[in-house]
Amino acid sequence: MESRDSKIYPGIRRLENDITRRRDAHGNRIAAAQSEQSVAAPYTRTVWVYVPAQYVKGTPAPLLVVQDGHGYLNLVLRVIDNLIAAGRVPVQVAVLIDSGGGDAQGSQRGLEYDTLSGRYSDFVESEVLLRIKQECDIVFTDDPEGRATMGASSGAACAFTLAWYHSERYRRVLCYSGTFVNQQSPPDPMTPRGAWEYHAHLIQEAARKPLRIWLEVGEKDLHHDDPEETWHNWPLANRRMANALKVKGYAYRFTLSLGARHVDPRVAEQTLPGALEWVWRGYLSTVEA
């Protein structure tokens, strides 16, 4: 997919200048206005579509949207294949989407994944899924209970954001090493600490949404020694997310992986089958009923 064809994300890249090189005392980037840290730039985005052999053409398919798709092709597709064959998850189509490139503040990936809004969900719905429907002749279910989303790092925060801002589209979320920290770019005065705001007050203050959420973080994940006031400690942020979800009465699971680091591949290899099975729990029985 070419950026020139997108009405929602025409493309940016981070500038390398004194502003974007700024760091706080703990080495974290400091966000700035988009005009100071980014410049318009084209990108090419790759999207993979996995259609299982069991899919019956023309029937509305349950959907799994995966952020940073290239990083999960082998693992996710192998796991889904095995789970479908065993009848442990619904027959589903997986859409694995690469970001528009770069990372963190000022980048296209940062704009897509770390922004707290419904913008990325609108992009997936109106530009990615619509094109797949047209070009691959696939019908996706409109039932939000039949739509899941997953990712790691900023892709995990993005997966949660997809469901949080559009729970009428997605109800099932799977997150590895979620970037629920102060990394939003450009800054937004409505959510000044970025995804840290989810566990600081957004989850507590909003009416409970019909979401099912699986969270994981490594014990030695990014900035695990940083103090809370940096709003940039991954293990702390994810523990706070789990507590906020618990207090509010959400269906959730939280895994703290001992000794593991950021997006530790050993953790995903060991936990993804059970995580996907738990995320989809209840959907098969509902459909069969």
How would you name each of these model-derived features?
Residues 1-289:
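Non-catalytic cap/lid and distal C-terminal segments of serine-dependent acyl enzymes
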